[in-house]
Amino acid sequence: VYGHEITNTARITKMNMILAGDGHSNIEMKDSLANPIDGTSTYTDENGVVHHNGFDIVLANMPYSQKTKYGKLYDLPSTNGDSICVQHCMKAINSASANGRMALVVPEGFLFRKDLTKTREYLLKNCQLQSIISLPQGVFLPYTGVKTDIIYATKVNQKIKDSERNKSFWYFDVKSDGYTLDNHRRKLDTPSDLSKYEEYRKFDKDQVENMLKVGFEIIPFDKVHRNSNILVGSRYREQKAIISNYDIVTIGDVATLVSGYGFPVALQGQAGTIPFYKVGDMNLSGNEIEMHDSRNYVSIEIAQERKWI
């Protein structure tokens, strides 16, 4: 295991690995972005044997929305840390490895922001995107409330013929990870969607019906390319006409609209009986709210205290 960490957390990591009896000598305290690893380069050992630099597998939960001064060291120079972090992880994969793959936790903004279009194009060109896992907002609380996704890709840094490329990738939307989506992160009695994702590992990926049964969606790359390489899977869902016996009413007739301040994070979560919605609950690519699936509830007592009811 190799790893870089810019803060003193690197020392804690090394200590934990020592206590666990695992190797720890390859954990270093340094700025990863200032020290890119070129997985396409080679070196010769003392016996004259040529080896490739880089790694077979890269796992990363990168810092979100940071700025960097080391963008010039990468193929797409930028001060945007999200772009450079993804490029750094890709660059570190051994190009000679037939099994070179990576799993990256990225802020959801990486999947749709206009200023990162070129980076997404670079990603799709230099690897085979296999799946994107959408995580619920709040999964990393209390450290950050940023909405995140997992990118899983194979054949990183390899030259892939067009005829060998997949025509689509899998998208899975996690609604619940088995814990409350608040600062307390209490374990829920209800099943976790992650248990469904575990089925992914058991299936032959060519058995499409089985994948669809556990909740995966197929996202065609041709649609992605026509939409600025936006990778938010929900954007490409087929719109189904819904016939309802209920009259259409304005939202003000069925809900209390409150604006002007943020709702305290400490009060957000699954505890309570009254659902509430925030601007952040909107689908980032479509301005639609899933009214049947609120991420947050509030108790009657708090709603009365806030004079909402």
Describe the residue ranges of each PLM region.
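Non-catalytic DNA-recognition/assembly elements of restriction-modification systems
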Residues: K205-P264
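Hydrophobic, well-ordered secondary-structure elements that form the walls
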Residues: C89, I151, S234
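Class I S-adenosyl-L-methionine
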Residues: L129-Q158, E164-R165
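SAM-dependent methyltransferase catalytic region
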Residues: V1-C127, S131
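Short, intrinsically disordered, charge-balanced linker/junction segments flanking boundaries
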Residues: V58, S168-K175, R185-E209, G280, ...
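Short, surface-exposed amphipathic charged segments that create phosphate/polyanion-binding patches used
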Residues: T40-D45, T144-Y152, R185-D193
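Short, well-ordered beta-strand micro-motif
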Residues: Y152-T154, D173, K278
